[in-house]
Amino acid sequence: MSTSTTRRVKLANLAPDFYKALIELDKVSDTGLDPKLAHLVRIRASQINGCAYCTDMHSLDLMEFGAEQQQRITLLPVWREAQKYYTEQEKAALQLTEAITLISVDHVPDDVYEIAAAAFDEKDLAQLIALIITINMWTRVGVTGKMEPGHYKP
């Protein structure tokens, strides 16, 4: 990991139209999905992409649903070994999140897609895919801009 102190451009200031469009996209990316599921998806993609800011932000958001969420957040990187803490829909969503986030590894395998398609109706599946794509954009903004955790307040 780089410890460079190179100043990074702030997209919010220098590409404001893009940044505003991303904010608007984010507002509709989880429409109709369970908020806890949506935050788990955001956290998992953020962990995979190494975005500390996004991981912190969405963990804090999920904690707003109660202290019992802490264990689910803690176990998220190893959710396959801790399946009893996640619903069937959440497990399907997490598996799809990992496939889409790591798309260069194996694209989105048919079996992963089929599990998600069985767990969600078509509209919610489309919304889930939109959410995963959106958080992946945000994590790239956060990592590229070296956004630091600890500044977000729910």
Annotated model-derived regions:
Residues M1-P154:
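Hydrophobic alpha-helical segments
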